[in-house]
Amino acid sequence: MTTGPSPIEMLTARNLECIRGEHRLFSNLSFSVNPGELMFVGGPNGSGKTSLLRLLCGLSLPDDGEIYWNGTDIRKLGVDYRDVMTYLGHLGGIKDDLTAIENLRISCALAGCEIDEDQAADALGQIGLAGREMLPARVLSQGQRRRVALARLLVTRTKLWILDEPLTALDVAAVELIKGILEHNLAKGGMVIMTTHQELVMSTVTVHHLVLS
């Protein structure tokens, strides 16, 4: 990983600092992620992993430092930055009373990526939920609910994916499926920044590890 903003780097963090209450989670944190690269963010609970991801997707502001997309501070980009970035939080945002299709379509619409019912059903089928598309989320297992949230990765057109614990509650087959989706995005020049407590071997792409303490 390299440091400092540059027009040729796709996502760059420079001297980030994050304070929560009286606790400094991290400071002077700098890195860059380029097309085709994956960065794993690790560290113990409470080290600031989720806080960092929220900074990178613009949901929170750093106490110090800057984040650049293609050489421009993301605070100046506004909606233009959200148009190139997909963020999936660790809770998934799944609503119990909505069907799998409804959950997927609404989450896509909120992210600025409208899809029709057929597209939603196709994505859910690809991610292993064929036959469960019209079931209310309340009857789905935790792993199936997670798949509904992750199905958005199959329809998004964004280059940068920021994923908070995407593998939580997934079985081995589902993890391998998500691994293939990530590799496909990276092969097209996409970028992935993610946290995970599970080991994920990615032998065909450039992988960085950022460990918070």
Curated annotation (Swiss-Prot):
Residues 11-213 form the ABC transporter domain. It is an enzyme of class 7 (translocase). Its EC number is 7.6.2.5. The keyword DNA repair does not apply. ATP binds at G43, P44, N45, G46, S47, G48, K49, T50. It comes from the Bacteria. The keyword Chloroplast does not apply. PROSITE patterns: ABC_TRANSPORTER_1 (PS00211), ABC_TRANSPORTER_2 (PS50893), CCMA (PS51243). It is found in: Cell inner membrane. InterPro entries: AAA+_ATPase, ABC_transporter-like_ATP-bd, ABC_transporter-like_CS, ABC_transptr_haem_export_CcmA, P-loop_NTPase. Belongs to the ABC transporter superfamily. CcmA exporter (TC 3.A.1.107) family. This is Cytochrome c biogenesis ATP-binding export protein CcmA. It comes from Nitrosomonas europaea (strain ATCC 19718 / CIP 103999 / KCTC 2705 / NBRC 14298). The gene is ccmA.
